[in-house]
Amino acid sequence: MPRLHDHVWSYPSAGAARPYSLPRGMIAAALCPQGPGAPEPEPAPRGQREGTAGFSARPGSWHHDLVQRSLVLFSFGVVLALVLNLLQIQRNVTLFPDEVIATIFSSAWWVPPCCGTAAAVVGLLYPCIDSHLGEPHKFKREWASVMRCIAVFVGINHASAKLDFANNVQLSLTLAALSLGLWWTFDRSRSGLGLGITIAFLATLITQFLVYNGVYQYTSPDFLYIRSWLPCIFFSGGVTVGNIGRQLAMGVPEKPHSD
């Protein structure tokens, strides 16, 4: 007669079927207590929460911040254009023909909006180029430095209208040195130098086109109907607006990318 322990401790043969075992996930779910008294599951890590719930909130926040920065830069460009144009008119540097004043271009109402739009484009372009090149600008990133840069730029523009040199070549070389000094003091980035030169070239071309078509004119033009020092003003203005755009972009989350 077989004994009980022979059946209990007998090892199954190779051909015998192995007992079925539940998956670990089902076992864990069965062992976890359910009901109102059960402990709440641990929250997911912060990175995972930002990757799911934050993904849908970031695009709207990014676009909202973009609009805010555009409005700030546009307002700055409008105010700066009014101030600098007033300095130029006081020194009798810029003259508007009578036939232009009598038309819709009276008091040059179109100049401040154009300068504001250009300031918004340039101010948004600088941090975008930095992000694209993978070289974030970290040199003197504080508002005090930005305000000093604005003051130096206004001083350069005021000097272009007030200082009297023996000839315009000396004035142009002096302003070019001051503009490069402004870039070296407040920027020192290759992208800032390249964008400043590009802005100076394009803005001078547009100004030459407007002067050539009689929209306005300069007293004593010395280089293709315009002042030869004008590219220096555009260069230093581009660097100044770029610093403002970079400062406004600090702490702004990057544009979300959809995989």
UniProtKB/Swiss-Prot annotation:
- Tell me which residues are marked as the site Required for the recognition of 25-hydroxycholesterol: 153
The protein's topology relative to the membrane is: Multi-pass membrane protein
The cross-references to InterPro entries, in alphabetical order and at most eight, read: INSIG_fam
> Which GO CC terms are listed, alphabetically?
endoplasmic reticulum; endoplasmic reticulum membrane; SREBP-SCAP-Insig complex
PTM comment text:
Phosphorylation at Ser-189 by PCK1 reduces binding to oxysterol, disrupting the interaction between INSIG1 and SCAP, thereby promoting nuclear translocation of SREBP proteins (SREBF1/SREBP1 or SREBF2/SREBP2) and subsequent transcription of downstream lipogenesis-related genes.
Superkingdom to which the source organism belongs:
Eukaryota
Per the record, what ranges lie on the membrane's Cytoplasmic side?
1-66, 127-141, 187-191, 246-259
Primary location recorded for the protein, binned into one broad class: endoplasmic reticulum
The record's subcellular locations are: Endoplasmic reticulum membrane
Query: What UniProt keywords apply to this chain's record, in alphabetical order?
Result: Cholesterol metabolism, Endoplasmic reticulum, Isopeptide bond, Lipid metabolism, Lipid-binding, Membrane, Phosphoprotein, Steroid metabolism, Sterol metabolism, Transmembrane, Transmembrane helix, Ubl conjugation
Q: Which residues lie on this side of the membrane: Extracellular?
A: 90-108, 165-167, 214-227
> Region entry Disordered: which residue ranges?
33-57
Q: Where is this motif: KxHxx?
A: 253-259
Record GO biological process: cellular response to insulin stimulus; cellular response to sterol; cholesterol biosynthetic process; cholesterol homeostasis; cholesterol metabolic process; cranial suture morphogenesis; inner ear morphogenesis; middle ear morphogenesis
Where expressed (tissues)?
Highly expressed in liver and kidney.
Induction, as annotated: By insulin and hepatectomy.
- Where does the record put the Glycyl lysine isopeptide (Lys-Gly) (interchain with G-Cter in ubiquitin) cross-link? 138, 140
What's a Gene Ontology MF term here? Answer: oxysterol binding
Q: Which residues cross the membrane?
A: 67-89, 109-126, 142-164, 168-186, 192-213, 228-245
Which positions bear Phosphoserine?
189
How is the quaternary structure described? Interacts with SCAP; interaction is direct and only takes place in the presence of sterols; it prevents interaction between SCAP and the coat protein complex II (COPII). Associates with the SCAP-SREBP complex (composed of SCAP and SREBF1/SREBP1 or SREBF2/SREBP2); association is mediated via its interaction with SCAP and only takes place in the presence of sterols. Interaction with SCAP is mutually exclusive with PAQR3.
Comment on protein domains: The KxHxx motif mediates association with the coatomer complex.
State the family it belongs to. Belongs to the INSIG family.
What function does this protein fulfil?
A: Oxysterol-binding protein that mediates feedback control of cholesterol synthesis by controlling both endoplasmic reticulum to Golgi transport of SCAP and degradation of HMGCR. Acts as a negative regulator of cholesterol biosynthesis by mediating the retention of the SCAP-SREBP complex in the endoplasmic reticulum, thereby blocking the processing of sterol regulatory element-binding proteins (SREBPs) SREBF1/SREBP1 and SREBF2/SREBP2. Binds oxysterol, including 25-hydroxycholesterol, regulating interaction with SCAP and retention of the SCAP-SREBP complex in the endoplasmic reticulum.
What is the name listed in the Swiss-Prot or TrEMBL entry for this protein?
Insulin-induced gene 1 protein
Q: Which organism is it from?
A: Rattus norvegicus
